[in-house]
Design a protein with these regions (language model features):
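Hydrophobic anchor at the beta1->P-loop junction of P-loop NTPases
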Residues: 5
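P-loop (Walker A) phosphate-binding loop of NTP-binding proteins
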Residues: 8
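ATP-binding Walker
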Residues: 11
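Walker A/P-loop
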Residues: 14
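Conserved substrate/cofactor phosphate-moiety recognition/catalytic segment
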Residues: 18-62
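Glycine-rich phosphate-binding loop used to anchor ATP phosphates in small-molecule kinases
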Residues: 54-99
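Conserved phosphate-donor/acceptor-positioning beta-strand/loop module used by diverse small-molecule
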Residues: 99-119
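Small-molecule kinase domains that catalyze NTP-dependent phosphoryl transfer to phosphate-bearing small molecules
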Residues: 121-163
């Protein structure tokens, strides 16, 4: 199974992936951001901007790596990464589904204030990139079709992991 955990920056994607990895047999966390850094970092300029999803190779490389890790290495994979574009969902997750891989999308949601406060708690400062783009990430991730939405406001990691496991079963 491949489980993509989306939502705005600071909503708890990585924290919840870490909470799930010990509860899902033979699972690992896949860092799609590292793929994005590699793709974008090898261009002498940023021809497609700063959003990884705008780089055509980002979708293709994630698709290929996830497919290989699942089919040839046998892993269940957790991917904590904001998806902003339906097109990215289609190019990665829908293709994996068409290949017969059980693929799920969980979309975490929280109020602006909750996300803002969580970003500050992890050590970021006002005016940082993720802080400046909270609304873009909230709106973009909430419009991607094909996922199960989970509200995270006022809930513990344990409560959210339990709900996620129920959704995945």
């Amino acid at each position: 199974m491949i489980i993509w955990i989306s939502g705005p920056y600071g909503v708890g994607k990585s924290t919840l992936a870490e909470g799930l990895v010990d509860k899902i047999e033979n699972s690992m966390i896949f860092d799609a951001e590292e793929v994005g850094n590699a793709v974008r970092g090898n261009y002498p300029t940023e021809p497609y901007g700063v959003i990884f999803e705008d780089y055509p190779l980002w979708c293709e490389f994630n698709y290929q790596l996830l497919k290989d890790l699942h089919e040839n290495q046998g892993y269940n994979i957790l991917v904590p990464m904001t998806l902003l574009r339906q097109n990215s969902y289609d190019k990665i997750l829908r293709r994996l589904q068409e290949d017969g891989i059980d693929t799920r999308l969980l979309i975490l949601e929280a109020t602006y204030q909750s996300v803002h406060d969580r970003i500050l708690m992890r050590g970021e400062e006002e005016g940082c990139w993720c802080m400046e783009n909270i609304e873009m990430a909230r709106e973009g991730s909430s419009t991607v079709q094909g996922g199960h939405h989970i509200i995270t406001d006022g809930r513990t990691v344990e409560e959210l992991v339990k709900e996620m496991l129920e959704v995945l079963s």
